Amino acid sequence: MIGSVRVLVLLLAFIVTASAIGYSGGGYQPHSCDGDWPEKFPEAPKGFQFRCKCPCKCPPKSPTTTSISTSTVSTTPERLTKPYEETDTPIPTHSSPSTSTSTSTSTSTSTSTSRSTSTVTPTTRSSTTTTATSTPTSSSKATTTSAQITQPEIPQAAPGTVLKGEEFPVKQDGLGDGGVVHGPGTTFWIRSPTPPNIPLLVGGQSRLATVRPDSPYASDAALNPLNGGAGDMEFGIKNVGTPKTPRAVINPDA
């Protein structure tokens, strides 16, 4: 009985040790994956998509592709004109036959590399041989319009309007379309954030004189801590007085 219990205890100890070794070793599982999905963030952040999620492996990268294309191009030269340019010069008239022979050979090679690691090396070789005999008897004239920039019109006062100083004509309320008076209105005005400026008056009757701020740079009374009203909100803010001078040093041996 005692021997069987000892064997059972040893067996349990062996199982526990093997389990601990397997747990610490990862159970033959890789510690990291080929993807970029972090282990601490199971959900993807907003606005960002990971390529793959652990323990899945990322798909293999696209292989490198190389393509070579060869083509023959025949072109006919044309007259080039600049855009938005007006030309009134007529094309001269040719009455004599002309014979022209041109041979051109060009070879161009370009290599471009994109994000998918692809290399494209197109080779284009064009060879053109033209022999033409023509007798044109025509005259043409090309005309193009040019773009013009127009400046906005500056508003002007109505004829017969007399402006004095900084005053300006203001159309009052209830006077109809033709009700224009000289000078700003009354009733209320909006303070300008950058004084000194003439206040913009809205509505009301005509004023005899233009209103100007008395002290455009004076601070408001509500913003001055020393001008607070008496009452419960009075905190007794006062200036600090001049401190007294220190006492003279006393000599104990005197």
UniProtKB/Swiss-Prot annotation:
Query: Where along the chain is composition biased (Low complexity)?
Result: 63-77, 89-146
Domain of life where this protein originates? Eukaryota
- Region Disordered, residue ranges: 60-161
**Designated name of the protein:** Uncharacterized protein F58A4.1
Species for this entry: Caenorhabditis elegans
